[in-house]
Amino acid sequence: MKLRCTKSYFNLPVAHMQWFDTNETGEPCTGPCAKWHGYDRSVHFEFAGEPDEHGWIVGFGDLKPVKEFLEFYFDHTALIAADDPRIEKAIQAHEDELVDLRILPYGVSMEMSSIFIWEQVNPFIYSVTDGRSYISRVECREHEKNSAFIEIEEKVALKQGKLTKRYLQQYTTWRRFVKPGDILKKYAK
């Protein structure tokens, strides 16, 4: 029997910028979303799997590392995409302690954030549930009006969950910062 449960995390104030946003000239980095702006994000997980001997899909007490991971990336931080042409300036702002920068490999949109979070957290869930459970959906909300989500088929989620490494693109600038999998790895069985 496949059961599902959910867990939500709120109050993740984060700034981001999307370099590809344009103004009426059509030039990248000129639109309003190309500048730092922020939202109070929330992340909502749906877990699926077989219940354990207590009847739980996921023990919510086991999710403290997930909260730590989300707070590291999305709590009072500034996000930038790894392919943003202004990345060196953002890194300089981080080094000057003007922002607490986090570099996301695919982009900072809700869609790309959903993928990033799923890739990092699903192997952890697989590990702490001894392979019984997986993340079937991750929804990222930037506020009450806008959200995006990723839904994953069971066989894909379980196959990815078995992997011990994360498939993140390794940009030169990325290496100066904590790799996301390192945060959760210390908690995995």
PLM segments and residue spans:
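Charge-rich, low-complexity N-terminal segments
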Residues: 1-189
